[in-house]
Amino acid sequence: MTDTPTKQEITSKNDKVPGAIPGEQKKNNRNNDRKRNRRGDSKNLERDSDWQERVVQIRRVSKTVKGGKKMSFRAIVVVGNEKGQVGVGVGKAGDVIGAVRKGVSDGKKNLVRVPLTPNNSIPTLSKGRDGAANVLIRPAAPGTGVIAGGSIRTVLELAGIKNVLAKRLGSKTPLNNARAAMVALSQLRTHKSASRERGISLEQLYS
């Protein structure tokens, strides 16, 4: 007469952990997954909290289609972490919130890393141009502040620059000025990198 295996013996053979009940093991696995997801979400929130967003302009725009005019919103957004990274983005959507959200996403895709000096200024003078807008930025002494206006000021502040002089020439369009400022910031080089590119020492660079 053969012995019939008990329920406990069957479950112990099927489970990875001997003697464990399948339902309890699945429940423990789900709890562990939730804990890992929470830890991952908290890290993402910490990274996102370092970034700031400022809306430079929101305009209502229209597009002529076959059935008439299609209205939408365009948002110009500047994103930065005030630690040397900044970006300008443009978003279009049927509502303002959607346009701003797309602008933030576009700005984070076009980030520029800015070399900052110990007194939160820029190392050298720089120029940038976008369309008919020209922007000139130059370093300033500690305590000067951000001497700039419009969208240029927003870009410089979110980049983490606290002492700088900026001058706008040509077009007054917020988007062109913001992009011209981005071009000027992207051309900045530290003193060491400038001397390395030119193949001379720091003493020869300033002699």
Curated annotation (Swiss-Prot):
Composition bias, Basic and acidic residues: 24-51
Alphabetically ordered keywords of this record: Ribonucleoprotein, Ribosomal protein, RNA-binding, rRNA-binding
InterPro entries in UniProt: Ribosomal_Su5_D2-typ_SF, Ribosomal_uS5, Ribosomal_uS5_bac-type, Ribosomal_uS5_C, Ribosomal_uS5_N, Ribosomal_uS5_N_CS, Ribsml_uS5_D2-typ_fold_subgr
Record-level GO BP terms: translation
Domain of life from the UniProt record: Bacteria
PROSITE patterns documented for this protein: RIBOSOMAL_S5, S5_DSRBD
Keyword Membrane carried by entry: no
Domain S5 DRBM as annotated: residue spans: 51-114
TM annotation in the entry: none
One protein family per Pfam: Ribosomal_S5
GO cellular component terms, A-Z: small ribosomal subunit
GO function term, MF aspect, one: structural constituent of ribosome
UniProt region (Disordered), positions on chain: 1-51
Record keyword Zinc-finger present: no
Record text about domains: The N-terminal domain interacts with the head of the 30S subunit; the C-terminal domain interacts with the body and contacts protein S4. The interaction surface between S4 and S5 is involved in control of translational fidelity.
Family designation: Belongs to the universal ribosomal protein uS5 family.
Function per UniProt: With S4 and S12 plays an important role in translational accuracy. Located at the back of the 30S subunit body where it stabilizes the conformation of the head with respect to the body.
Self-association and partners: Part of the 30S ribosomal subunit. Contacts proteins S4 and S8.
Protein name (record): Small ribosomal subunit protein uS5
Lineage: Bacteria, Bacillati, Cyanobacteriota, Cyanophyceae, Synechococcales
GN (gene name): rpsE
